[in-house]
């Protein structure tokens, strides 16, 4: 993998330490590449930009019920190997084309990994898998991969964790998510209000749905907050609000919430809040205990609800890679190609089977 080019800023750091007040726990400061420079080095270009716009509109149409297809956001828990991720994308693109009349496939391409305590923080933060924190290289690798995935014909979905990251990659993204640990965060609600694509808010890790519903309402409003502009300069960003935010059910504290009674409760909560009674269900996380076999079963249960005529379920999320399960990242040990180093995933064969089942469910729903 390529190395970043950020230079260390030493003078400011030493001056800060000498006054005995500032930056006493900062080891070093490294210059971050400005967004505009990275966008010029790795341009979206007209054809790719048109694909992103088209993908966003298709997602919106599904979320708003104008398109009867089911959106399926599917891909690795968190990308650690761009080569394997692109291999996966090419297989997924072929399957997407086969099922495109019934399923809108969005590839999950996650680069930032929220941690409950510590651990690998994702490709952008640690692209070399060695805790070196080479964020400049991580941003380049991430953007390059997004462009390559777009070239396969797939729209892209990302989780947004760091509020600065979107300036580097958001122009490539058709759908975004705010995770369970950050749905309650004002910073992320403000961020979502200014993003140019639909954003899903997950229910909290304890299963609380109201927090995510409140987040959807908050992100629909306009906000002003501190961020950076394309030149990398500090700026105050004024947003118009995002009308395309929605709820994602992901279970909580080991208890799933994808079964019909929990889905109905969530729809009632949305209705009381004055929001459209439509939602996305994450078949992984606490809806499966991060167990690939249970995730596959959860996907089947969700497909059955769709087949039975439930039009409120407009999307599903799956954690999927080439090889089932997960592996530990151990220094000096070779990694299994195509297997997750974060949450356990279903393998490619089960992924293809799940997509086919979702497509059949949509056909049944249309006829119900």
Residue ranges and their predicted role:
Residues 7-13, 49-52:
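Long, contiguous binding/interaction regions
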Residues 11-30:
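Polybasic, low-complexity association/targeting segments
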Residues 18-22, 102-258, 262-263, 285-286, ...:
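Active-site-facing alpha/beta catalytic cores
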Residues 25-64:
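N- or domain-start disorder-to-order transition segments that initiate the globular core
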Residues 71-84, 343:
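Conserved phosphate/anionic-ligand binding catalytic regions in large, soluble enzymes, centered on
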Residues 75, 281, 347:
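Conserved, mostly hydrophobic/aromatic
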Residues 321-366:
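Internal helix-turn-beta structural module
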